Amino acid sequence: MQWSAGAGLPGKVAVVTGAAGAIGAEVAVAFAAAGVSVLAVDVDSDGLANVLSMLEGGPHASEALDLRRLDEHDRLLRRAVDELGGFDILAHVAGVLIRRANLDEVTEEDWDFQHDVNLKASFFLNRAAGRLMRDRGAGGRIINFSSQGWWSGGFGGSVVYAATKGGIVSMTRGLARTYAADAITVNAVSPGAVDTPMLRGGLTDEQLEQQVSQVPMGYMAEPSDLAGAVLFLASDHARYITGTTINVSGGWLMY
């Protein structure tokens, strides 16, 4: 390996889902700062416009898309090739959380919505990405997002969400084995407590304080802390890492 400050990222093309959210936006900004062209994807068109305005360099593009539209995945990824000149990285950050006070409040709709977005759409998008990367013959990086809930089982009524994130870990391992021979790595990032609207939503101040008190480093992560892990996994420095879930939790989760 030849060492470089850019770690092989300048000139690459990344598709970032959930790009209008707190973590996804930071991932997109970090990629652009590293010389990567970004196709930012989210259901929030106004949020995408804001994120696109923050990206340096380029070219960049955005698309408002509900990833539950599985038949759009191939076209979406092909757009990165056609408009930005390639497809090297999928940073799949998109996810939803419906937190209920207890199990009895969980509805079938809660279950279906979270599994459709967090797990079903993730599998089919990962598969579409792996196929396109394999066909292009230049390898690639797929980076999924799990959660500390995959290990802990969730908190604050988020058991269904945790179940989907456990599925992400298993799926990531299986796809890593599937695509390894094609020089495509598949990994996941597992956040702990990150200061985002998703984390704060549905929690009382007391519950939030209790959660932060369990973090050995004593504070919540910022979205940029997660973006750093994504850039590492997308870089040449991580070329021999696959099937791994990187825990970014300030010591909250240790395994």
Region roles according to the model:
Residues 34-50:
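Conserved glycine-rich Rossmann-like NAD(P)H-binding loop of the short-chain dehydrogenase/reductase
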Residues 101-103, 107-115, 211:
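Substrate-binding pocket helix/loop in short-chain dehydrogenase/reductase
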Residues 1-6, 97-100, 231, 242-255:
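Short C-terminal tail/terminal secondary-structure segment
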Residues 131, 177-181, 239:
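Alpha-helical segment proximal to the catalytic Tyr-Lys
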